[in-house]
Amino acid sequence: MPIRERRITAADHGHLLTNVGVWSPDGTRIVFDIRSDAAGSIFDGDRIMAVDVRDGSVETLYRSRRGACCGVVTWHPNADRVVFIHGPEDPTPDWNYGASRRRGVVLDLKPGAEPETLDACELTEPFVAGALRGGSHVHTWSADGSLIAFTYEDQLLVERTGTIGVESNRRQVGVAIPGRPVTVSRRHPRNHDGSSFCVVVTDVQETARPRSDDLLRCCSDAWIGTNGYVDALGVRRSKAIAFQGRVPIGRTNDDGMIETIDEVFVVDLPKELARAGERPLE
């Protein structure tokens, strides 16, 4: 049978797909956003939409308001529910869309359902367990839909960049636990509550040792399998995430800068994610 492409959308705006999780659970619809440039680097879309691949009909699932933009949407693996990036409402010159100034939004597609903010944000001390201090990005569900992975950047570290003794902001990987809401203070106008308890599951270093597992940056995360994997000792790791980790390779370039490369790493998630480990949850 010859291969044949079939166009299923036609409109005067962009149609951008996330690189995973765009199909509805029943395999009839594809979800997308409407950012204006093909590369998706300009975050200016205001709609989350879905197209029915059977007849080409298009439905607007969500439209952002008050100057906010939205995009990078993925579908729940077995429910009529989506999650996507949402920029700040009422943006200002000092608080507009950016890597550390965005959040996840979950939308149940049942009639009458209201969108809910995924991740709480607390920008003032004392910090709150389960709340982030910045922005989440590219949200993907685990195979059973019980967890949501995302990448994360810290707004407070962005603001303090260059301060002696303060680590710089570096992208990391986090996980949200739906159904465990987090409430924060109203001491900062951009604080907000979230429907999920969030934790950062990677660790980055300000100065990484060459040829070590010290990480400078984490990105491009992906859930492993539908039920994790079995490790070398025969132990089932039911929840695990693979990601790209940036590491130094021990040589300098022509500008005298330490060269780095991205390696593949795996993080095995504990059964109780909301329990503090070597670092606090706040």
Explain the meaning of each model-derived region.
Residues 1-282:
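Sequence signature of WD/YWTD-type beta-propeller architectures
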